[in-house]
Amino acid sequence: MSNKDQEIKEEAPVAIEDLSNPVVVDSYNAAGIIANNAIKHVISKCVVGALVVDICQYGDDFIEAEAAKTFTKRKNLEKGIAFPTCVSVNNCVGHFSPLKGNTRTLKQGDVVKIDLGCHIDGYIAVGAHTIIIGNTSAESMTGKVADAICAAHYALEAALRMIRPGKTSNEVTQVIEKISDMYGVTSVSGILSHELKRFIIDGEKVIFSKNEPSQKIQTYEFQENEVYCIDIVMSTGEGKAREEADRPTIYRRNLDSTYKLKSKASRDFKDQIVKRYSALPFPLRNFDEKVSKLGLVELVEHQVLAAYPVLFDRSGCEVVQFKTTVLVLPNGNHKLIGTEFPLPFVRSEFSVTDDAIKALIASPLKINKKAAKKASATTIDVKMQ
């Protein structure tokens, strides 16, 4: 692309906010590159003895710095963190992004989930990856953690290929469940994969990781030009996420709230949130501690802000996570995050045994139109019960 072409794209107004607009696709791709690189750099900081809070701050700073370098000719363009850097260890399911002064460090053998996101003009790319601290042995790791890593990886790859026009959200859920059963691990309850829209990180269309009797599940058919965050979280334990002693440190604005704040401190804090993060999630750590403490209580009490609770499975189990953002394009799906991350060096005694799911995982994300015309009768079809 020439500099002139780049200038035209940077200055082009965005009227259509879906993938039929090339400017929107460019924004998603730019956000994906930054988020992808952020995870790679955060992985390099995850060593024995490293402070988790320092790693999280490094990830946030990296995203902000890289986003500031993009689309510089488009004035007043909002860009930066779409989801704060979280480093959730062992049985912590997610949302661990501690405040300054937290002393948690990484230890040899810790199962570490890195989760973060970037946006350009509200177009969001989020991703997560799991590593094992010190997993550099010449011999592959085996056992339940290895089983969970393999299950989560293959479930993500299968879901990536199923989110296509004509397929439904419930079909994806069933494939995720089948794969977790094959590896003898558990999808964590309450984990949802969401449709993404401009400045909306948790769209109305969702994909459940497992079907549960207590859930009211609405089935959606996927459409061309949609964008989804696929979030796969597997546990070696019972897969029931719960809150423990750690208080939430990540919040987002509740756009449905009409409450008029009474405290000046609360109003000032809200103004800072809107200016820096719009409607997207933010970490308390990135605000002055006095300002956030004074303003937070009223905002939370009256549901002006919604919290992301720090969640845990039971003690003694391990939780793994792989997450990416997928663009559902006419010529196939485009995976924004995670294409270059090496998996932990693990080996499972289990495998994907369903022939249709194996064929699905082995199939390309991009559609070969010539091959598709010749082989329309042999389209991969994962049978559901």
UniProtKB/Swiss-Prot annotation:
Gene3D superfamilies: Creatinase/methionine aminopeptidase superfamily, Winged helix-like DNA-binding domain superfamily/Winged helix DNA-binding domain. CDD domains: PA2G4-like (cd01089). InterPro entries: Creatinase/aminopeptidase-like (IPR036005), PA2G4 (IPR004545), PA2G4/ARX1 (IPR047113), Pept_M24 (IPR000994), Pept_M24_MAP (IPR001714), WH-like_DNA-bd_sf (IPR036388), WH_DNA-bd_sf (IPR036390). One of its GO terms (cellular component) is phagocytic vesicle. Transmembrane segments: none annotated. Belongs to the peptidase M24 family. This is Proliferation-associated protein A. The gene is prlA.
